[in-house]
Amino acid sequence: MIGNKTVVYTSGTFDMLHYNHLKMLEYARALGDILIVGVNTDELVASYKSQPIIPFEERIGLMKAIKGPDIVIPQKSLDHTDKIKKLHFDIFVVGDDWVGKYDYLEKLGICVV
């Protein structure tokens, strides 16, 4: 929380940005006052799947250009523990393909949806 504002954080590759990405961002936006979006770097993506089709600089540029996110940052790690300390987020939104992988954040007081 920043002041009395609820901070929502989500992250993803956002390669080939599509309708479901936008719906997820719209959902995340509705959960709080400030939406921060982390865009996975090419190096991070390469650690768990094949390289993205769209390069990182273009993906982060697309995310900055759309309505919804208040802040867009590079996501360099799948571990979000340091991000909690820096960004003070209250809610972490995960896509369907990541459900269950961030439950450890709940032990740190973060609502994972």
Region annotations inferred by a language model:
Residues 1-113:
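Nucleotidyltransferase catalytic core that binds NTPs
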